[in-house]
């Protein structure tokens, strides 16, 4: 399924507010609410829309630190790490990447001691580098049509 210009308009609305009623979306894009529902359903079935998420504030949830941690896996440790990383509550995003490091993780931590403890778990799998996030400059930027 290709994403036509009308579907992109609907996606723009949903990316801005996934809870926006279909009647409002329809008004904004110029079609009926049932037509919006049908298009959304087709995009869900085609895995264009893969889910709807709640954005929770890490600070309000009790986490004082957000960090970016890269891991350069030791020989033979990458595959086991790719399984174990799924079990870490601290990891909110994890990417396998090219370059000197194999992994980039976005993690949330309660405090400095928690960070130290988490890094201690990771060093079994490889060499880590940690950067503390100071501020979130771009957050959940909406996807736009490919040019």
Where are the language model's segments positioned?
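A compositional/biophysical signature of low hydrophobicity enriched in polar/charged and small residues
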Residues: 1-147
